[in-house]
From Swiss-Prot:
InterPro entries: AAA_16 (IPR041664), Beta-prop_NWD2_C (IPR056534), NACHT-WD_repeat (IPR052752), P-loop_NTPase (IPR027417), Quinoprotein_ADH-like_sf (IPR011047), WD40/YVTN_repeat-like_dom_sf (IPR015943), WD40_repeat_dom_sf (IPR036322), WD40_rpt (IPR001680). This is NACHT and WD repeat domain-containing protein 2. Residues 410-737 form the NACHT domain. Residues 1703-1715 have a biased composition (Polar residues). LRR repeats lie at residues 386-410, 677-698, 724-747, 883-906, 925-953. Keywords: Leucine-rich repeat, Repeat, WD repeat. It comes from the Eukaryota. It comes from Mus musculus.
Length: 1742
């Protein structure tokens, strides 16, 4: 629980004592189940199976799942019900084995359940007496004699009971009923089934009758005691009630419940056949009566025994009396009514008992060290319980542990082969060490014993975590204050040595490390450099290892030289093994006969390992004296014996169930709990098919618990329990068992994948919440139906089974179990899901579930960070990335690293921090959408601020790979279809394949010392072709890096011999190469690696290009000639010549879609040829560029072939191939030259590099705007290479460093609009979602609230100073420093009219949008009509900080010492308040909900409430002395009750204006701005970080929302730019922040006290951006300009309208209602329409 839930409740003394015992290693003081809160709630159901079937089925279907959910959510524990009768066949109810198992499990539940443990369901049926499974020989013979005496036939007993001399003493046992076929009451053949059952029914009834009569006779004769007779005369239910309730304390009985159902006058209905299952009957039809003897026993149990218990304790007992239907008896309807009531009462009782008895245990949740210690302690107790050998080794270890007076001490080493008992020996030592030391050093001593079974927990695999956990345990035990544990491994080792020296005579120390070979190689742990060879006097270290693993024993011998410090565990001799076996058998009252002993001795002569002895014991304990035993009865190796054990289990429980159960336990990362095993097997259709072989399945489809119990019993001691984080897991006791289970059950890949999928689905919660999983029954059940008379019924059955789906009752799997929805930080972590899900998803190939179920799941991220597992988060993301190669994961990991410190300190801020960083890039990284939506859904639980639009500049650095000391050594770079793999060629002849992310060299080829001229990959990346200075082409198999062939390129016979390969290219199946100054092109077959023929051209070849289909080759030559050849035949088709034939063909481009060829010559001229008729190409376009003095650097055809990018030294041109004209042209700045340019994959961006510039530039192709300029820290970029597979770019710098840039991320980074200047003011309309910003320039920018992009720019003549909007936002009035005012139509961008004449100090607009108030400092202020521009009145008084009252009657402002209310109709001062002499007004505000009350603060440090109506001070509040010295701002709540005052410090001052009390709330930093929400519930403020706070992230300030009701900060969000303006919207609590770079951030507040949780986040348009995949970049903004001509000129008291003004010219003295002229009526209409729209769209708001 976090952050301090556990701290709110002091731990009880028992817990503290348990904790102390665990930390000091006093294992005998720990309870058997170890987990402080109990391992689970386990409830045993005691009932007669016949009459409670419906109740138990209903409880299982509806009540148990709810109780399980309750326990998981509130206590982090499992709720398990043990009902062994459920799901098994009727003929097994009487089984002695089942009854024995029931009593054993009942005892377990009573001992180990953390809460309720026993529920009795008792009806009118007493139940059958039991058939004994085994009877001592003397007792059995006495019963036989008594039966003969009673004249009973005893042949049946003699036939069914067999004498067994292997029992001690000898006994008779009931033979197995193998001859009785398995059947079930639900079978589709009831009559046949009954016939099958009859013989056994009769036999069992007769056996019971004989036992009953004989035992009664013996009891009457005094030959048998009552306690003995009970075995034969009592029913199972009485035994269970007596055992559970008979001798218990009142405190214990609080955990038990009994439900008694009485049926009134049941005897009357005895003849109704269906009533036989509700009571005991005797006799045959028609003389059927209720069994009086059974009724007597029932009354004794129900009406005497239970009431006696109730009288002495608080046992809960509920009795209900049911009345039968007169005709039908105990009908279905009556039973259903009873069951409904029982279900409700059962649920309430269980909840009551759980809440009263189970403690919420958060210790292991918050304390990983405590959990680690408990895990090893529980393993230690388990292993010690299996220790059998009392050997000399134990005495040596005992002697070693005791303190010695002299001599130096070394660690002691125990070694031996597998299965020699090293772990059990060390566990026994660890268990006894505390007691030995305590006994030796006296009662006042307090020894410390630390035990670790290496490799069994996450913290005991690596040396670093092992040393850390041991050091932490030492520090706690020896009360050493360690400020922080070292990060470096050598420092950690030094700390470990120092802590060893803390031991003393009173506090000796023993450290036991089992299985050193299990340590990982990390930090060179296996070299044992960390192990101290010499120990302090009171320290003992005991180690164990295998002798031949990793050379550990050899290294130990180099470290510790004394032979006395080594104990070798060698196999025992045969005699000792026989002795041990004999003792083990006697403990369970068994032995072997002398004849059988021969075969035992024979087995022990082959193997005497302790584990073999134990496995042999498992086998021989089941031998019977009359059964034949031979050499094959016992295996002779451990391996074979384990296999034999598993096979015997398969016979008992079913092959599929055992193989899958053991398979799941083996493949689970940490093991499985018992309930998880049940759940997972229920989801496995192959297991359920086996279990439902002869029955029709029904809901819920589960594995009967009996099979799980048999499995556990059969593997007792081998499948052990281990406690991890409040959960008890089943794990293998040793690695040998695990290896054999793996070999037998986890070999087939298809099975493995299916099982991993089932486990992954389980931990994902795919089938939870009642979701039904399809189940198709296999043939055996249907085959059993073949003798049905009606064939159509069989078809119906088949159809039913094909369509059937069943609830498997899998539990929900949230990441955390929430105790209280209103306290989201109090929770139990679902550690099982945390540890298992990722493991199974990566092994079953469910990539989407891996991404969206874990990594992109906000709840997982938040929980992991909250519990301190930040580094594990990064490791898991890296694992998922390696598995899926999704670049979103890489970006998420770098994002998390950048906010590490912030979210570790304040995990609640995670959602806001992620949203700020992910929103700008989500259009380019679409898989992050899921995480953003998760943040929207779950983030507001922890942080109420939700960013709607983020303007954060995302930092990005490419992957870098140093290739050589200089770019001159790098010959070629090739990207591949794998985004992280590149091929590089160096001039020294080496070709390397690199993984750029890991900087790992994957493969390398050396080209035999020849210099590489170039290399190319075939389109399918099958072949790598390399050109060398030896004039050879080397063709390699790219996958295996092996040379396939080497082809020499030859020129013409008359050519000079010293020429090199000038160039080469690849087509689909061919390579084409040509030499310098050669007219021939050699064509090579790639598949066979030999030259086919040579193309002979007219002139020297300069470039070659092939068509996409690989049919034609185009050879460019000198004098601008191009010859076309057929690649298949070598035929020359034609030659074309450009008109500008002075130079040579430098580039050729083939446009397959348009059937065109483009020739670009050395001077940049370009010609386009139509190749539809390949034999006669036609010239269609010609561009003469010879006048330009700029050479062509590179050329590229866009992927869709719609544009050609031509990069020249001084310019970049984009040629539209549709119209063949230059679409865009970008010129380099003065003294700058382009080195290279390419198009992004989608063609939206141009990427270029400049000469001598260490940066990559990104331009938007449509606007020419520079989106980003990214610095390359490794030096000037000399080469750009674009990937044809991914939107990636490779750049090579002068220093020989290769960088890989992700263009998607860079495009997204630049997807933020900025005005370029600091935002000075933000204006929001009362309605609508548009934002207007002023930034000290001549523009007003109109922002789209939803997208955060600039929609329009309104240009003015001067710098814009003021801006106001009508309430709908349709009209905008602005003023600039050139004394002009403008009225704009915001939708069309039209400047409707312009007024000149006076510089405005403040603009106001009335609430009804009819009038504008233009306040001036130097001249008269004016009120004018917005629709016409006509003056209403002049205001002669200068006003500051003015407001218009809500009734639109007054404009209220202040002067130095007065508050004035001026009439909007006359301009005269109607009301005023004057301060006393020398006192000035500092600030004032209107109260929104009280429009006639004004609040102002004076220099006398008083806050005054002044009534405008009465012109009196209503209330005056005196502030503390010097309070206003640094007044920054103050806000008034809408109801006028609170005033919020900020003084530029770290305090928020909340003033209660009614009581005058001042409350100070500490803020997170120095407050810069504050704003009160419109409803007065929240205060939004921005504060700057304290200087002493050390955070690695670049946050400058924080945006914080405080809920005024409780003063709690409900949200905080870092701001990474300097804020310049803060605004809140009126309608919703939306926050808009303007920044110094001209960008804006938009946030909203979602407080959970809001009923609807502001669903607007998910539905808001800002979220539609990333739901709309097509929108990847910001749209172009519209630009609107001001009117040059002035429509109206203001003079001192008059207006002069221009002749062409849209406003009617009229005298100011005329009526205010002016009529517009006909000429300009349209403009007037537009203004009026804009004003009218408010009444159509919204309700009027005065």
């Amino acid at each position: 629980m976090w952050p301090a839930g556990a701290g709110t409740k002091l731990p009880c003394p028992r817990d503290s004592a348990l904790r102390r015992a665990a930390f000091s290693g006093n294992l005998t003081a720990l309870p058997s189940h170890l987990v402080p809160a109990g391992r689970s709630v386990r409830v045993f159901i005691s009932a007669n199976p016949e009459d409670t079937g419906a109740e138990r089925q209903a409880l299982r279907e509806t009540v148990y799942p709810k109780l399980r959910e309750f326990c998981r959510e509130n206590y982090g524990l499992e709720f398990q019900v043990i009902d062994l009768y459920w799901g098994i066949e009727e003929d097994e109810w009487d089984s002695p084995e089942l009854q024995k198992m029931r009593m054993k499990l009942l005892e377990e539940c009573l001992k180990t359940s953390a809460g309720p443990c026993f529920v009795g369901l008792l009806g009118e049926k007493y139940g059958n007496i039991r058939i004994p499974g085994e009877v001592e020989a003397s007792e059995f013979e006495m019963i036989l004699d008594a039966a003969v005496e009673a004249k009973l036939e005893t042949k049946l007993l003699e036939d069914w009971y067999c004498r067994d001399e292997n029992s001690v003493p000898a006994a008779y046992y009931l033979r197995p009923r193998l001859e009785v076929p398995r059947s079930n009451k639900n079978s589709t053949q009831p009559s046949a089934s009954s016939e099958q059952e009859r013989p056994w029914q009769e036999i069992s009834d007769e056996i019971k009758t004989i036992f009953k009569a004989a035992v009664k006779l013996l009891h009457e004769q005094g030959k048998m005691k009552q306690s003995q007779a009970k075995r034969y005369l009592f029913s199972a239910i009485e035994d269970e009630f007596d055992f559970a309730l008979g001798k218990q304390t009142p405190a214990f009985l609080k955990k038990c419940v009994c439900y008694i159902r009485k049926i009134a006058n049941i005897e009357r209905f005895v003849k109704i056949p269906e009533m036989g299952k509700y009571m005991d009957i005797t006799g045959t039809d028609p003389r059927i009566v209720r069994d009086p003897e059974a009724q007597e026993k029932l009354i004794k149990l129900r009406d005497e025994f239970i009431p006696t218990i109730v009288a002495s304790s608080n046992l809960r007992v509920y009795t209900s009396v049911t009345h039968c239907d007169m005709k039908l008896g105990y009908s279905q309807e009556i039973e259903n009514h009873y069951i409904e009531g029982l279900g409700k009462q059962f649920y309430e009782d269980m909840i009551d008992i759980i809440q009263a008895t189970v403690q919420q245990n958060f210790d292991t949740e918050t304390d990983t060290l405590y959990d680690e210690i408990l895990q090893h302690s529980s393993l230690c107790k388990t292993y010690a319980s299996f220790y059998e050998y009392k050997c000399e080794s134990l005495n040596i270890l005992h002697k070693y542990i005791l303190p010695s007076k002299t001599g130096h001490i070394n660690p002691l080493v125990v070694y031996g082969g597998p299965c020699t008992g090293k772990t059990l020996l060390l566990a026994e030592v660890a268990k006894k060490a505390y007691g030995w030391l305590h006994e030796d050093t006296g009662p006042d001593s307090d020894p410390v014993v630390i035990v670790r079974f290496l490799g069994t927990t996450d913290m005991s695999i690596d040396l670093r975590t092992l040393l850390l956990s041991v050091c932490e345990q030492l520090a706690v035990n020896y009360r050493c204050l360690v400020q922080s544990f070292p990060k470096k491994i050598h420092d950690l080792r030094d700390l470990f040595i120092n802590l060893l020296n803390e031991s003393s005579l009173q506090r000796p120390l023993v450290i036991i490390l089992d299985a050193l070979e299990q340590l990982s190689e990390a930090d060179e742990a296996r070299k044992l450099w960390w192990l101290p060879a010499h120990l302090p006097r009171f320290v003992r270290i005991i180690l164990s290892t295998l002798p031949n693993k990793h050379g550990i024993l050899q290294k130990l011998r180099c470290l510790i030289h004394e032979e006395d410090n080594y104990i070798e565990l060698i196999p025992r001799d045969r005699k000792m093994c026989s002795q041990v076996l004999k003792h083990q058998l006697l403990r369970v009252k068994r032995k072997v006969t002398s004849g059988q002993q021969i075969y035992v001795n024979n087995a022990f002569s082959k193997c005497t390992l302790p584990m073999f002895v134990n496995l042999t014991f498992r086998e021989v304990r089941h031998w019977r004296s009359h059964k034949d035993v031979d050499e094959s009865s016992l295996c002779v190796t451990v391996h074979e014996s384990i296999e034999q054990l598993f096979w015997s289990l398969e016979k008992k429980c079913g092959q599929k169930l055992v193989s899958r159960a053991l398979g799941y336990i083996t493949m689970a990362k940490m093991g499985l709990s018992e309930m998880e095993l049940e759940d997972v097997l229920a989801l496995d259709n192959s297991v359920m098919n086996e279990l439902n072989e002869n029955t029709r399945p029904s809901n819920p489809l589960r594995v009967p618990y009996l099979y799980i119990a048999r499995l556990k019993e059969g593997l007792n001691g081998y499948l052990i329990e281990r406690h991890v984080k409040n959960v008890t897991l089943l794990v293998w006791a040793n690695r040998h068992l695990q290896l054999i289970a793996q070999k037998l059950y986890l070999q087939e890949d298809s099975n493995l994948r299916e099982m991993h999928t089932i486990l992954a689905d389980y931990f994902l919660g795919v089938w939870s919440g009642g979701r039904r999983k399809a189940f198709c029954l296999e043939d055996p059940y249907l085959n059993g139906c073949l003798d049905l008379e009606n064939r159509s019924l069989l078809e119906e059955e088949k159809h039913f089974m094909e369509q059937a789906s069943f609830d498997r009752q899998a539990p929900d799997q949230p990441w955390v179990f929430q105790c209280n929805p209103l306290e989201p930080d109090i929770f139990f972590v679902n550690h099982r899901k945390m540890s298992e899900l990722l493991y199974h998803l990566t092994r079953c190939g469910k990539t989407d579930d891996l991404l969206y179920g874990i990594i992109m799941n906000f709840s997982w991220l938040y929980t992991m960070i909250k519990i301190g597992q930040f580094d594990k988060v990064l490791a898991d993301i890296e694992l998922a990335y390696n598995y899926s190669q999704e670049k979103e994961l890489k970006f998420l990991a770098s994002t998390l690293r950048s906010i590490r410190n912030k979210v570790i300190a304040f995990p609640g801020s995670l959602s806001a921090e992620l949203q700020q960083r992910l929103l700008p890039v989500v259009s380019s990284l679409p898989k992050l959408r899921h995480l953003l939506l998760e943040c929207d859904k779950d983030g507001p639980k922890y942080c109420s601020i939700v960013p709607l639009h983020s303007s954060m500049d995302v930092t990005y650095s490419p992957e870098r790979l140093p290739l050589a000391s200089s770019h001159l050594h790098v010959t070629e770079i090739l990207p591949t279809c794998n985004p992280s793999t590149v091929l590089t060629a160096l001039e020294n002849g080496s070709i390397s394949t690199w993984d750029v992310e890991t900087r790992q060299l994957l493969r390398q080829i050396t080209t035999a010392q020849s210099v590489i001229l170039g290399m190319k990959l075939s389109s399918d990346e099958k072949y790598l072709v390399v050109a060398t200075t030896n004039n050879t082409l080397l063709i390699y198999d790219n996958v295996n890096s092996c040379l396939l062939s080497e082809v020499e390129i030859k020129g013409t016979k008359h050519g000079s011999g010293s020429t090199y390969i000038n160039g080469f290219t690849l087509s689909v199946n061919h390579a084409l190469a040509w030499l310098e100054a050669s007219k021939d092109v050699t064509v090579i077959d790639l598949l066979y690696g030999w030259p086919l023929y040579q193309f002979h051209c007219w002139y020297e070849v300069t470039c070659v290009q092939c068509s996409l289909d690989g049919v034609y080759a185009f050879c460019g030559q000198y004098l601008n000639n191009t010859t076309i050849f057929h690649l298949g035949s070598g035929e020359k088709i034609c030659t074309v010549t450009s008109e500008f034939s002075g130079g040579f063909v430098k580039f050729l481009l083939i446009l397959d879609t348009a059937q065109e060829m483009v020739m670009v010559d050395s001077e940049g001229s370009l010609s386009v040829w139509n190749t539809e008729d390949i034999s006669n190409p036609q010239l269609t376009e010609d561009f003469d560029c010879r006048k330009e003095d700029s050479e062509v650097v590179s050329i590229e055809l866009s992927e869709d072939q719609s544009a050609i990018l031509i990069c020249k030294a001084l310019s970049i041109e984009l040629l539209d191939t549709g119209m063949w004209k230059v679409a865009e042209k970008f010129r380099a700045r003065h003294n700058e030259r382009f080195v290279s340019a390419v198009l992004s994959k989608n063609g939206d961006c141009i990427i270029a590099t400049m000469e001598n510039t260490p940066a990559v530039f990104f331009w938007r192709r449509d606007t020419g705007q520079c989106l980003a300029s990214l610095q390359e820290s490794s030096g000037t970029i000399v080469k750009l290479v674009k990937s044809s597979h991914h939107n990636m770019l490779l750049s090579l710098s002068t220093s020989g460093v290769l960088s890989i840039w992700d263009i998607d991320i860079i495009t997204a980074m630049s997807n933020i609009d900025k005005t370029g200047k600091p935002i000075q003011s933000l204006v929001l309309p009362a309605r609508g979602e548009i934002i207007y910003s002023l930034d000290g320039s001549d523009c007003v920018h109109k922002w789209n609230f939803s997208s955060g992009f600039i929609e329009a720019v309104f240009k003015h003549e001067g710098i814009v100073e003021h801006c106001v909007l009508t309430s709908t936002g349709d009209l905008m009035v602005t003023s600039d420093d050139k004394s002009s005012q403008y009225v704009w139509h915001t939708s069309s961008g039209e400047n409707l009219f312009r007024i000149n004449g006076q510089r405005i100090s403040q603009l106001l607009i009335t609430h009804n949008d009819q009038f504008v108030v233009s306040l001036c400092e130097e001249n008269a202020s004016r009120v004018w009509r917005l629709a016409t521009g006509h003056r209403v009145c002049n205001i002669l008084t200068t006003l500051q900080n003015a407001f218009i009252t809500s009734a639109n009657t007054f404009v209220v402002g202040m002067t130095k010492s007065k508050v004035l209310a001026v009439s909007l109709w006359t301009g005269s001062i109607t009301k005023k308040f004057c301060c006393e002499d020398g006192i000035t007004i500092v600030n004032f505000k209107l109260i929104p909900d009280c429009p006639d009350v004004i609040v102002f603060i004076t220099s006398a440090e008083t806050v005054n409430l002044w009534s405008l109506t009465d012109e009196v001070i209503c209330r005056r509040v005196q502030l503390p002395s010097n309070f206003l010295k640094n007044l920054e701002d103050f806000e008034i709540s809408p109801n006028g009750k609170l005033g919020i005052i900020s003084r530029g410090d770290e305090n928020i001052n909340v003033l209660d204006l009614h009581s005058g009390k001042l409350r100070v709330v500490h803020a997170s930093g120095v407050i810069w701005r504050q704003r009160l929400s419109r409803d007065g519930r929240y205060l939004v403020y921005i504060c700057f970080r304290n200087g002493e706070e050390e955070e690695e992230n670049d946050a400058i300030s924080s945006l914080i929302v405080m809920r005024l009701a409780d003063g709690k900060n409900i949200g905080a969000c870092s701001l990474y730019k300097t804020p310049t303006f803060l605004a809140l919207s009126q309608r919703h609590l939306n926050i808009i922040v303007g920044f110094d770079d001209g960008s804006i951030g938009i946030y909203t507040v979602v407080d959970r006290v809001d009923a609807a949780l502001k669903i607007k986040i998910a539905t808001s348009n800002s979220r539609q951006i990333f739901n709309n995949a097509t929108q990847t970049s910001r749209p172009k903004s519209n630009s609107y300009s001001f009117k040059v001509s002035v429509d109206c000129l203001w003079r001192e008291s008059t207006e002069v309208f221009a002749r062409d003004s849209p406003i009617t010219v009229s005298d100011s003295s005329e009526s205010n209602e002016a009529t517009p002229s006909k000429k300009h009526n349209s403009c007037y209409d537009r203004v009026c329409a804009a004003l009218e729209s408010r009444s159509h769209s919204y309700t009027p708001d005065n």
